[in-house]
């Protein structure tokens, strides 16, 4: 194990400030506080980062007028490692495989619904909730045997106006929070990380500090097109699969039917949805 990695548990960032060649962090844990001088601060935070707010980094936000209902659900049949997505009248329903817990075949669900429907779902008893979810998902995994505690949060797209500054880079949801329709937020973040590592390695070879803007701008130049394509593709999918307009319903049905009959189109769509093209 590396002795150069220090894990701080139950620590909080109390303050952050820029300096000539990096970022200073004031960190607190219990009654202790100390200052860390970093050459590069990699801020991998949530979409509502207090550190970004303190640094004055604003975001571009777009609300989708949808809520995500999340929960762990047990099914009659095993998922065998397969993820499912259903496109309902109110939005997509994703069913994602989890490890088996005792004898339960568990999945995690992300159920996109309109705000009024989310209130109805949260107020439902388990019998009514199971029936409603079963009708939306179907019986591919048999009957639903149990639904865990429900969580609910509004869905929106949030993009940081700045992802890099001298000595600072934003990664993950703090840089770009996407609608879960294509499940690409995590994949995009992993590609961002890979690209950042390559830029830092190149800077190291050239004798340039990792927080230097030449290194960070190289990273941004590499990733900007990837980010733009995934963000745009995801946003268009939301519009297409959350609309009840007759023209878009027809396009949606025709498109999904075409994917079944033309394997090349299906493969191309899948690669696009995964952010690989």
Kindly give the residue locations of the regions a language model identified:
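A conserved short coil-to-beta-strand element within the FAD-binding core of flavoproteins
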Residues: 9-23
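FAD/FMN-dependent oxidoreductases across multiple families
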Residues: 119-211
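C-terminal helical "tail/cap" subdomain of flavin- and related membrane-associated enzymes
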Residues: 198-277
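Pyridoxal 5′-phosphate
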Residues: 18-22, 79, 189
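Conserved FAD-binding catalytic core of PHBH/FMO-like flavoproteins
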Residues: 26, 30-35, 40-150
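A structural signal for the hydrophobic beta-strands that form the central parallel beta-sheet
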Residues: 7-9, 43, 170
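N-terminal Rossmann-like dinucleotide/flavin-binding domain of flavoprotein oxidoreductases
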Residues: 1-6
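Structural motif
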Residues: 19, 89, 164-165
């Amino acid at each position: 194990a590396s002795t150069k990695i220090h894990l701080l548990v139950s620590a909080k960032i109390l303050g952050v400030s820029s300096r000539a060649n990096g970022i200073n962090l004031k960190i607190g844990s219990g009654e202790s506080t100390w200052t860390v001088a970093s050459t590069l601060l990699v801020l991998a935070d949530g979409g509502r980062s207090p550190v970004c707010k303190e640094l004055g980094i604003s975001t571009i936000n777009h609300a989708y007028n949808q809520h995500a209902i999340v929960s762990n659900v047990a099914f009659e049949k095993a998922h065998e490692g397969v993820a499912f997505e259903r496109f309902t009248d109110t939005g997509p329903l994703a069913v994602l495989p989890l490890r088996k817990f005792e004898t339960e075949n568990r999945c995690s669900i992300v159920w996109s619904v309109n705000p009024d429907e989310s209130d109805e779902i949260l107020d439902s008893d388990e019998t009514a909730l199971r029936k409603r979810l079963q009708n939306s998902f179907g019986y591919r995994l048999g009957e639903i045997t149990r639904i865990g505690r429900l969580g609910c949060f509004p869905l929106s797209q949030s993009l940081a106006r700045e992802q890099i500054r001298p000595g600072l880079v934003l990664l993950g949801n703090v840089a770009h929070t996407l609608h879960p329709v294509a499940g690409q937020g995590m994949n995009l973040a992993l590609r961002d990380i890979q690209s950042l590592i390559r830029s830092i390695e190149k800077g190291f070879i050239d004798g340039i500090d990792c927080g230097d803007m030449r290194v960070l701008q190289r990273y941004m130049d590499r990733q900007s097109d990837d980010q733009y394509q995934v963000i745009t593709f995801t946003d268009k999918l939301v519009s297409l699969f959350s609309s009840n307009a007759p023209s878009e319903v027809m396009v949606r049905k025709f498109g999904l039917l075409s994917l079944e009959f033309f394997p090349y189109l299906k493969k191309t769509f899948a690669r696009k949805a995964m952010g690989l093209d």
